[in-house]
């Protein structure tokens, strides 16, 4: 199976927990032996582990035509993406985006991480996804968290392929209930258009169909995996905590505060 995966960060450049989760999922799917993963990242740096997936640098995907040579493309983006892919992508431009802020390759730059203009970058990412979706061959679309839901929706609209979104957290979790209406709208739109919703916990799954009004039949709990400890760590003797006597020493709060006031 060929997977077109949209992510926002990837080790070793970790801005949050999403990078680690994305890496683990990519490695886990690759280990199945029958998965071909293409991972789209807004700003890869070239030192990412590519053993489990091919990486598409979204900041090197043209959305406007530029007459450039293979040598120039290799010099500019050869360290982050296969230069031949640039020309394949350029053959699938679907609109004239010269009015946008594009560079000498006809591509848009990304700050990386979570900049102040995050919503603008999310929109730009989804525009670029349209070129990628028209170029590559894939069977299913996997979008990680709300940042990439618009890109996943665009790819589904272009290809008709099923969309699986991965809910690592909802804005109800991140904001402790003080939900940003713009973020909520993006999240709900992603869920409404998804064929499958993967939730990292049963609590998240309950939030998805209670707060976002989704059909429970398309919501699945898929817990994050853990790496087993190496044998040398498991062999370390553990302290014996079978004793009954416990001694706890501390000063009373009143005493501590009264001394601080002196």
Regions found by a protein language model. Name each.
Residues 118-128, 162-164, 172-189, 228:
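Nucleotide-sugar donor phosphate/pyrophosphate-binding loop at the beta->alpha transition
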Residues 239-254:
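Conserved donor-binding/catalytic core segment of Leloir-type glycosyltransferases
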Residues 3, 140-142, 149, 153-174:
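Active-site proximal beta-strand in glycosyltransferases
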Residues 130-135, 157, 180-197:
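Membrane-proximal helix-turn-helix segments that form the acceptor-binding/catalytic region
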Residues 203, 225:
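Carbohydrate-associated surface elements
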Residues 141-142, 193-201:
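A short beta-strand/loop micro-motif in the catalytic core of glycosyltransferases
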């Amino acid at each position: 199976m060929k997977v077109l995966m949209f992510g926002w960060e990837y080790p070793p450049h970790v801005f949050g927990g999403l990078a680690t989760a994305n890496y683990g999922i990519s490695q886990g799917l690759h280990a199945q032996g029958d998965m071909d993963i293409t991972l789209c990242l807004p700003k890869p740096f070239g030192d990412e582990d590519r053993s489990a997936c091919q990486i598409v640098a979204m900041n090197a995907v043209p959305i406007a035509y530029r007459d450039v040579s293979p040598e120039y493309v290799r010099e500019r983006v050869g360290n982050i993406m296969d230069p031949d892919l640039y020309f394949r992508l350029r053959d699938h431009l679907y609109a004239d985006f010269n009015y946008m802020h594009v560079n000498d390759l006809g591509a848009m730059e990304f700050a990386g991480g979570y900049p102040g203009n995050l919503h603008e970058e999310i929109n730009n990412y989804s525009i670029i996804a349209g070129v990628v979706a028209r170029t590559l061959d894939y069977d299913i679309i996997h979008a990680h968290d709300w940042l990439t839901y618009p890109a996943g929706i665009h790819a589904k609209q272009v290809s008709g392929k099923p969309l699986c979104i991965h809910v690592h957290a909802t804005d109800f979790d991140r904001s402790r209930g003080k939900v940003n209406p713009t973020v909520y709208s993006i999240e709900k739109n992603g869920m409404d258009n998804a064929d499958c919703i993967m939730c990292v916990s049963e609590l998240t799954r309950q939030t998805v169909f209670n707060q976002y009004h989704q059909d429970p039949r398309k919501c699945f709990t898929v817990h994050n995996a853990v790496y087993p400890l190496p044998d040398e760590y498991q062999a370390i003797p553990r302290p014996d905590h079978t004793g009954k006597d416990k001694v706890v020493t501390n000063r009373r709060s009143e005493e501590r505060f009264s001394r601080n006031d002196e």
